[in-house]
Amino acid sequence: MKTAHEVRPGNVIMFEGSPWVVQKTETTRSGRNAAIVKLKLKNLLLNSGTETTFKGEDKIDDIILDRLDCTYSYFADPMYVFMDAEYNQYDVEAENLGDAAAYIVDGMEETCQVTFYDGKAISVEMPTTIVREVIYTEPSARGDTSGKVMKPATITGGGTISVADFVKVGDKIEIDTRTGEFKKRV
């Protein structure tokens, strides 16, 4: 168990009978009152979010989840199938992938981390950066070069992100999977 003060982003806690990952913490202190810790949480089973507050000394159950490095194998509607180094396969429901679904493509070489709770695969964490090909974007607008000009682009996997104006169809780009932002052309 941890106190609310000790909880950090990335920790997984048990809250209202479900595992939640802490996305953000904010501590406020007032003159005579005890510190208040505000947590932004994401439910790992339902893929929903909430914010809640605790007193600084409140006890919180922290849990350690099993994580395995896996590679994407194939899609069997509605499950994405991942395989570990020992050729064990794990099914992850499409709704549990969240934003990661936009970056998953057949034949991808990146290794993902699959998270387990009670022996069941519940989420997938993509690598921090990935390289994908642009399959559709509008041509650049001539003369529109003042400042940082961005335009929408569709990448392999079906996701849409904002890219720099100079990016063309067929270009390979690096993407930050935590924010979904274009980093550079590769």
Swiss-Prot record:
Electron transport listed as a keyword: no
Glycosylation sites: 32
Cysteine pairings via disulfide bonds: none
PTM section of the record: Glycosylated ar Arg-32 by EarP: arginine rhamnosylation is required for EF-P function and rescue of polyproline stalled ribosomes.
Biological processes per GO annotation: peptide biosynthetic process
Annotated Pfam families: EFP (PF01132), EFP_N (PF08207), Elong-fact-P_C (PF09285)
Entry similarity comment: Belongs to the elongation factor P family.
Descriptive protein name: Elongation factor P
Source organism of this protein record: Shewanella oneidensis (strain ATCC 700550 / JCM 31522 / CIP 106686 / LMG 19005 / NCIMB 14063 / MR-1)
